[in-house]
Amino acid sequence: MLPGNTFKPIPSFASLREPDRVSKNLDEIDLKILAEIQADGRITNVELAKRVGISPPPCLRGVRTLEEEGYIQGYRGLLDPRRLGFDVTVFASVHLSSQAEADLRAFEAFVRAEPLVRECWMLSGEVDFILKCVAPDMATFQDFVTHLTAAPHVRNVRTSLVLHNSKYEAAVPLDLKAVG
């Protein structure tokens, strides 16, 4: 792991609507650094510098700048939920009875406190939020759904059990950024 790395939390949904999130022009070195770190978050600075084609000190400065500017939000290990006993993955579509800003924030706070919810996305259209949830078994998930449907302003919840994951790619397609 690179020295000086710290986890930076992902911003709330409300902050994603702020206009100051415009991407700076990333140069070729920035994109190479991001691609290498995205492929291997445990890469050493010396190895990263070699792969990117620069010396270690400017490489480390580049990584720190990308961290400070929020391009690198943190470093995590990818774990296998099934091997850890989380055999059930479900997507839950949540419809709220109110879309007032305070109610949306309250729902987001509710979801952040729920350990079975691994991702929460606010959507436009027929569904207000979609949640990706994991559970050790269906009984545990059903208890969570009962709890979720009782939350303030939740009008209804529809769930879809994952049968098979055909693709999981956490990486951002940087090759498209380089072309565009």
Task: Please state what every model-predicted region is.
Residues 1-180:
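A compositional/biophysical signature of low hydrophobicity enriched in polar/charged and small residues
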